[in-house]
């Protein structure tokens, strides 16, 4: 029998059987009915690799390649391992240990002398990846064969978190890998902790995208994710005496063991240039700057399923011919490599600073790169599956494109460009296809987050796309005029101003005269008697005043902008909000004019989070309790079963186990805090946590001012009075402030100053500690959330679209304090009003409250004035907080007048915190509240959300592999 042996550049997953590729491996067995591999060397060999074998893997495609016979003296016929065809990567511990040792030797990233934790992690990850590749190839070979409709999820962020524990857990290989690593002198948890968090996202937007991918795979939906491969991420946060400092992320410094570079999957991306007519009469975009987007694939495994989907990340580079060798050899090294740098920098940093024109251009390049590369790839895959008979009308029947916020909105003109300019379709046909294919998820009601781009910049950078956008805008104007007519010019003008894609741009020439307002009537003698000046009197008055005429200041023309949210609404077939209250605000306020025109487009899809990562894997203590008490582990896939805990909420045995699990998780956080900050905290104190992006609307400022008030009151009491009045608390913050967001960075600085003062006050001791955990990420969240007892979700009502951390906290038995905002509303409904601490103004009150403030009618509460005065007393150091506290002062002006209503909600917040203390003193009551939160969180699984997207927006079906 012909065999193929593993070479030093192998993954270790190639078969040594009569099969010619990974694709054929997963589609058929060999003659004897078994899968045979030489993956795991049987002998206990020295781990020093041969120098000639130190090559890195580059799997270029999943297509079959010609058979090959390569000999390797290291492996002989006695070393074959027979693995079951159902799960070829579910071997025993001995086989897994051999696999890990194999990768330590033959896919090394470290020197061969020592086999220590970092090397153990990479070898283990490569071993697990072998399993993923097998299932991954099986998944897409089957999808290609049955040619199913597929969803493509485009997002600027994917905040994945560590992959090793998640992959091993989803594959059901915890025991095998745990035992194997013990044989090698390691434990799985320590090895997994070596993995850096991928720096591909920042906040809830990216984490939601990653939860969705997990659910898509777990539920067997055919789907891909598309994003960018950021070399340095957002930034690594350091906390110093000056507050937050930013440094480049180094997550790729030792490479990423999960990704597979697809050098054969690359697409040209163009910027600048000009638009001309080709010889066929069709428009062509030529000249300008050309770069290449290269695919890096990351397998995403489902839980207890063979389905493994793909996250395709794009990296950018310049074509080799753009390297100016002549300039380089003449000593002009920087000039020679300029094109290379300009291409590569597109994927350097997530959300580069955009205060400069160059920064804005870079961000726009990022967004277009994501859209263009992804759509070229999607179109190519559609054509391949269609064979030689491509019917473009079927494109929306095979492809669904979901835009995660407005960042990928250039998908709309880009798909139009591809269909018209490259595939020869008419405008009408291309527009119908585009609208049926694309859908848009709105994530915000904040005006600054509803993206707008300078028309001038876009015309320069993407001239063909601006032509297409102008045409879409013209068609929109035609629709608006047709809908509202010209009888009421004021109404028509109002609608056009609100709904057009192009802002502050003259109407298209075809509609230049559509708004005709009545001319003023001539003044009659009767008018003159009533005090109205005649034309002659006006001329006389004007003549008398000519001598005193003042030349007016020149009017500054407002900038011409492209409104991406409007383009997303017009160009797609569905628009969804991400929580019930948010979707109502979207319909009633943000896009109300569009709702009146196309009500069928708008819907709600309340966010969710994956219960695999956010309970099952990050909180094994709680997971075991849930499984034991409801009698099945099926809740991991069917979270509605968690609701069965409600009937045991008062059971003393359950409550005792529940508190013990929480204590174990708190002890882990005690160690984390000591390691990251140097502070020692008591595990017996309440853990009060707010971890999220630092932003004024999320109101970390309200939280820390509440802590300041608490501290002030403590200082006014004797020791015995303090202990009687207050429950011991550890108040934990985490989150990053954008590098250019000055006010958010001031909040970080203020929190750390308050922490330094309180934590070093011997009178307070363990009664109150304030901790800011630096460089917050998914891995930190996986420790903090299971240990949390109170979590703060206190945004100004109506400003948080949904939030997902509130769901994670609730799942883990944490009681929430918050406003009626975002998903808080639905969480409170599910867990019970008595198990949620509610305070603050409601969303429908906010406009009037701001109006009252502007009119000088707001009277601040004395406690709020007391706190501000205390902050200004210098108790927290010599730093000035005038700018920070000044934002809470006055009645009008940019950056003032307490826009986020911290002062308005402060007394309600303090009163609510007193109720928290009261409830926590009764541990039986508190534990019941905790259990009811977990039991009521079942709705907030991303599995439910993805089922809704699949049914209502994407129209895709679940596809189980045979």
From Swiss-Prot:
**Entry keywords, A to Z:** Allosteric enzyme, Carbohydrate metabolism, Chloroplast, Glycosyltransferase, Plastid, Pyridoxal phosphate, Transferase, Transit peptide
Q: Record's superkingdom?
A: Eukaryota
Annotated region (Disordered) at 525-552
A Pfam family of the record is Phosphorylase
Quote the CDD domains the UniProt record gives: GT35_Glycogen_Phosphorylase (cd04300)
Q: Where in the cell is it found?
A: Plastid, Chloroplast stroma
One Gene Ontology molecular-function label: 1,4-alpha-oligoglucan phosphorylase activity
GO BP terms: namely: carbohydrate metabolic process; response to temperature stimulus; response to water deprivation
Q: What class of enzyme is it?
A: transferase
According to the UniProt record, one GO cellular component term is: chloroplast stroma
Residues modified as N6-(pyridoxal phosphate)lysine: 808
Function description: Phosphorylase is an important allosteric enzyme in carbohydrate metabolism. Enzymes from different sources differ in their regulatory mechanisms and in their natural substrates. However, all known phosphorylases share catalytic and structural properties. May be not required for the degradation of starch, but the phosphorolysis of starch may play an important role in water stress tolerance.
Task: List the protein's name.
Answer: Alpha-glucan phosphorylase 1
* Organism listed in the record: Arabidopsis thaliana
